[in-house]
Amino acid sequence: MNQVSDRLAAMSPSATLAMSQKSSELKAQGVDVINLSVGEPDFTTPTHIKEAAKKAIDDNFSFYSPVTGYATLRNVICQKLKKENNLEFTPDQIVCSNGAKQSVCNVILSIISKGDEVIVPAPYWVSYIEMVKLAEGTNVIVEAGLDQNFKITAEQLEKAITPKTKGLILCSPSNPTGAVYSKSELEALAKVIEKHPNIIVIADEIYEHINYVGKHESIAQ
């Protein structure tokens, strides 16, 4: 008897975590391994972050928080978006969650219904397509190879859109390629999206400060 749901059965294990597990097993056997799988820092948590976490416990931040996050945090996020990205948002437009992975998954589960299509530029982070599967959506993979610096074009985006298209996942700077979309490239993509108001752009910009190519621009700008 199958004990899991069809949604879970349709998903694939994370290749990243599988590689990390294999690395740990080899290290335990005494093998010298360089682990390039998971994106973990090569340093421990900075002291000021540890102290802030300890202080939060001492200050009794151990009860249920507001669903959208603490107001003070949402205010600071708005200030960051204004200062660093020149984007105007109010705290009421901000929802906090436990990291980028949960944020992206929450959005996908909130907007994607069975049969909805989500455009995913490739190469892509392995978890994107699994999140769409979990929402019972359909992944539409758009290949962007080395010849185009791993970035999809406006023409490719337009061609991939169908009446079932509900979302576009756009990661810049990109995981895993490091590719960064320029302002003009984002504007070209935005012009395509503007013609299809039912499509929601899921902009994963978690790596905006890990950028070795050029200036980070947000499609929200």
Please tell me what each predicted stretch does.
Residues 122, 141-145:
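Short beta->alpha connector loops at strand-helix junctions that form conserved
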